[in-house]
Amino acid sequence: MALRTDWNGVFPAMVTPFRENGSFDEASFKALIELYISEGVKGVVVTGSTGEWYSMSDAERATVWEVAVEASSGRITVIAGTSAVGTREALALTRTAKAVGVDGCMLLPPGGIFAARNEVVNYFHTLAGVGLPIMVYNNPPRTGVNMDADMVAEIAKSEEIVSFKDINRYLYAASEIIYRVCDKLAVFTGLEPYASSVLPRGAVGVVSTISNICAANMVSYYNAVISGDSATAYKTQKLIDQLYHFLPTLGAPAFVSVKAAMKLLGRPGGEIRLPHLPANEALIGKLREELRRLKMMTLN
């Protein structure tokens, strides 16, 4: 398969809106997709970690994919998170995603088992047999697997492997992967502040959790970096950096804080689902204060 030149830009790692009773809030999800499209994103990743896939049944994930395809109507790229612990489970999910009509899928290595190098390579080659374009996701803290350039190049030998998302905080290692495979794979960073460093090296986009809070700003940041507009890049990156470093200080899982921020900003992120617990008043108060300081919300 040829390099996916249409996979580029800002792809929000979408939250999945839930109602207070835990059910999927389809109306809010559709509203979010429309909001992101209006803010200039080029694609979305649904039912990834930010989308709380680990709390959803396979049927629920399939429903989210169907709604995403319907709501986007071909206007943006839709990537379905089809990660699972076992190969059989991931194969079944990826086949379902293909049948639904998504543009591609995003997959972590098998999680929680610290898979060996050859097992990870075989895992992705096996899943490539489904025939759906795959974005390989390197997230060492979640999987215990840190892919280096040699491993990614080996995985990329399968034609259906078309993209790579990396959250490696070691810039040299991230750069080595980009240099090695950017002629074959559309490389995305999952670390928003790193975009200004990896895009000039050959990466093509950002899969962004923070975009749930400020997609328009993230798009402006990406466009400024790509076009060489250093003044706008500085202004927009400053906001992103501050959000990126502030959210972990709240002491809650990122997705809890992101949904709380969305609610404060009037963005339809919905409720969090168990095992996560809703943001408490102390966290919400700190969030409100920071969003005001960053001039992202009014004082009322």
From Swiss-Prot:
Q: Which residues form the active site?
A: 49 (charge relay system), 137 (proton donor), 165 (schiff-base intermediate with substrate)
UniProt main location, coarse: cytoplasm
Q: Which UniProt keywords apply?
A: Cytoplasm, Lyase, Plasmid, Schiff base
Induction info reads: Expressed in vegetatively growing cells and in nodules.
What does UniProt give as the signal peptide span?
Answer: none
Looking at the UniProt record, the site noted as Involved in proton transfer during cleavage sits at: 137
Which GO biological process entries does UniProt record here?
small molecule metabolic process
Instruction: Look up the domain of life of the source.
Output: Bacteria
Instruction: Give the InterPro entries listed for this entry.
Output: Aldolase_TIM, DapA-like, Schiff_base-form_aldolases_AS
Query: For this protein, what is the EC number?
Result: 4.-.-.-
What SMART domains does the record point to? DHDPS
- Any one Pfam family match given in the protein's UniProt record, by short name: DHDPS
Q: Does Cytoplasm count among this protein's keywords? A: yes
State a single Gene Ontology molecular function: 4-hydroxy-tetrahydrodipicolinate synthase activity
Enzyme class of the recorded protein, top EC level:
lyase
Subcellular location(s): the record lists: Cytoplasm
Gene Ontology CC entries for this record: cytoplasm
| Function comment | Upon expression in E.coli complements a dapA deletion mutation, but this may not be its physiological function.
Among PANTHER family, the record links this protein to: 4-HYDROXY-2-OXOGLUTARATE ALDOLASE, MITOCHONDRIAL, DIHYDRODIPICOLINATE SYNTHASE
To which protein family does this belong? Belongs to the DapA family.
Quaternary structure (record): Homotetramer.
Q: What is this protein called?
A: Uncharacterized DapA-like lyase
